[in-house]
Amino acid sequence: MRTERDDSTVDALNELLRGELSAVESYDKALPAVEDKPALRSDLQECRASHEARVERIRRAIEQVGGEPARASGAWGLFAKAVAGGARALGWKTVVSTLEEGEDHGLKEYKDALPRLDEGLRHLVSSELYPQQQRTHSVMSALKRVASA
């Protein structure tokens, strides 16, 4: 039987998992908007792959502590739902800006989760997952600056 602390850890991990699922969905919906921009498409595919890898890593961590991984996406999945089929109509600059906002939200989610995790999982997040989130955020921030220029 899990303790209250374990439940808090599982809850925090599931929040991160939902955010990562949302990110993957969002990138899937955004990619059609950049079909004619190979370099930008490559950057978005790389960010999507990073989020997908984090989905798998967080799922494993949840299972290792005896939890049930979330299956539904979280808050920034709203982007994916909002642009379902319409990313091309938004234009690539709007898509990049929106993805950067999602990446920013992801940074906050990771920071907020840290105090609720046990020591081992805190290390996983701070040394592996959070740096990956910082990287995808940096990529999207740089692309947003280019889009704004």
Where does each model-flagged region fall?
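Structural signal for well-ordered, non-membrane alpha-helices
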Residues: 21-28, 52-59, 107, 111, ...
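Alpha-helical bundle segments that constitute or directly flank the non-heme di-iron/ferroxidase center
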Residues: 2-36, 93-116
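Alpha-helical scaffold segments that form or flank carboxylate-/histidine-based iron centers
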Residues: 8-16, 36-56, 92-96, 121-134
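Carboxylate-rich helix-loop segments that flank metal/cofactor sites and access channels
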Residues: 56-94, 98-107
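Preference for long, well-ordered alpha-helical segments
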Residues: 102-149
